[in-house]
Amino acid sequence: MTREEALLWLDQHIGISRETVEKLDAFVACLHAEMAHQNLIARSTVDDLWGRHIIDSAQLLPLARKEAAFNKKASPKSWLDLGSGAGFPGIIIAILSEMAVTLVESRRKRVEFLEKAAEAAGTPVTILGQRLENIEPQAFDIITARAFAPLDKLWRLAFPFSHNESLWLLPKGQNARTELEETRKLWQGDTRIEGSVTDPQSAIIVATHIHPKKQKTGKKT
């Protein structure tokens, strides 16, 4: 997908201003410059950066808006992105929306890049340079994680950062359905799988009301 094709998709599905385009361009320039120092994304995806990474991230925003409208909820205000790495989807969401976005990334060099990228794009974000389990929990309206951890581990670590109405938007590969099924013994909630607009073999797990199942205990005799 070219830059022009990506911008057309963004305008049709989200609505973007000239200022937003400038912020995206600044972020892309920063990422390209940093690639000389660290591998932020796979080299094989650099030529399709706008489709493989930017639109792949941006597609989560219409899903969030659709979910809020369908359930007649107030617009979400806080977004937690786990393992933000190169800024996908966290910084892209921050550029495209007015939500308060918090990025969690434990790797020092990635944290330094996220700080530079957010400054270059003129986009305010909160960056927590720690492991998730070492962060004081607070509840967020939306939680995302792109290649962060297997689903069961992800829910176990991130559950303290959710409330009952939190929306989970979790990009996964072709094994999304299998991964979801494997969690049903320990977790419950409302879940569905949405197709990815950028890769027919990928999917997005959409979930709400996630909480651990009460484990049955054996009866005393």
UniProtKB/Swiss-Prot annotation:
GO terms under cellular component: cytosol
Binding sites annotated in the UniProt record for S-adenosyl-L-methionine: 83, 88, 132-133, 146
Keywords: Cytoplasm, Methyltransferase, rRNA processing, S-adenosyl-L-methionine, Transferase
EC number: 2.1.1.170
Catalytic activity, reaction form: guanosine(527) in 16S rRNA + S-adenosyl-L-methionine = N(7)-methylguanosine(527) in 16S rRNA + S-adenosyl-L-homocysteine
Pfam families: GidB (PF02527)
Domain of life: Bacteria
UniProt-recorded name of the protein: Ribosomal RNA small subunit methyltransferase G
Family of this protein: Belongs to the methyltransferase superfamily. RNA methyltransferase RsmG family.
Gene Ontology MF terms: rRNA (guanine-N7-)-methyltransferase activity
Compartment(s) of residence: Cytoplasm
Enzyme class of the recorded protein, top EC level: transferase
Function: Specifically methylates the N7 position of guanine in position 527 of 16S rRNA.
Source species of the chain: Zymomonas mobilis subsp. mobilis (strain ATCC 31821 / ZM4 / CP4)
TM region(s), chain numbering: none
InterPro entries according to UniProt: rRNA_ssu_MeTfrase_G (IPR003682), SAM-dependent_MTases_sf (IPR029063)
